[in-house]
From Swiss-Prot:
It comes from the Bacteria. One of its GO terms (cellular component) is proton-transporting ATP synthase complex. InterPro entries: ATP_synth_B-like_membr_sf, ATP_synth_b/b'su_bac/chlpt, ATP_synth_F0_bsu_bac. This is ATP synthase subunit b. The lineage of its organism: Bacteria, Bacillati, Cyanobacteriota, Cyanophyceae, Oscillatoriophycideae. It is found in: Cellular thylakoid membrane. SUPFAM superfamilies: F1F0 ATP synthase subunit B, membrane domain. The keyword Zinc does not apply. It comes from Trichodesmium erythraeum (strain IMS101). CDD domains: ATP-synt_Fo_b.
Length: 177
């Protein structure tokens, strides 16, 4: 085998048949041969692979477009739901504000009525206490006046004057009957 290499090297030195040790030239020639063989024998095989790949890519694109349309539809639906929810929230807020105002007015009216009722009750209680106090004062004054009159009558009237007073009082009562 060593002999073959020696012969090939000698032949290459004479520019004849032999091994070409220039790798760049050799690789280009080999690459050209490989491409020619592939183009001749493998167009159906490569075409089949490329068409399958193309079909796969087209299917992926269709699926992506379909998902995009579904997403757009879902987005539109969700935006509509959001708009409806916002409108409903605004209605609820307006209703709550209206109810709050109504409750506030009722509470204020009830408070005013309670204040008036308390004032009336206080005035009635004061009038009642005033009437009681006046009645007590009259009773006390009447008792004191009677006590004073009795004491004055006992001091100023003797028995004879008392008898004349009783007789005149009986006479007046007898005339009225």
């Amino acid at each position: 085998m060593v002999n073959v290499l020696l012969l090939a090297t000698e032949a290459s030195a004479e520019k004849g048949f032999g091994l070409n040790l220039d790798l760049l030239d050799t690789n280009l020639i080999n690459l050209g041969i490989l491409i020619a063989v592939l183009l001749y024998f493998a167009p159906g095989f490569i075409g089949k692979i490329l068409s399958e790949r193309r079909a796969t890519i087209e299917q992926a694109i269709k699926e992506a477009e379909q998902r995009q349309q579904e997403a757009a539809t879902a987005l539109a639906e969700q935006q509509q739901n959001l708009t409806q929810a916002q409108a409903e929230a605004e209605k609820i807020l307006a209703l709550a504000e209206t109810r709050a105002q109504e409750v506030k007015q009722r509470i204020e009216l009830q408070a005013e009525q309670d204040i008036e009722r308390m004032k009336t009750a206080a005035n009635q209680e004061m009038d009642s206490e005033k009437d009681k106090a006046i009645a007590q004062l009259r009773s006390i004054l009447a008792s004191k006046a009677l006590a004073k009159v009795e004491s004055q009558l006992q001091e100023t009237l003797d028995e004879n004057a008392q008898q004349q007073l009783i007789d005149s009082s009986i006479g007046r009562l007898g005339g009225q009957l």
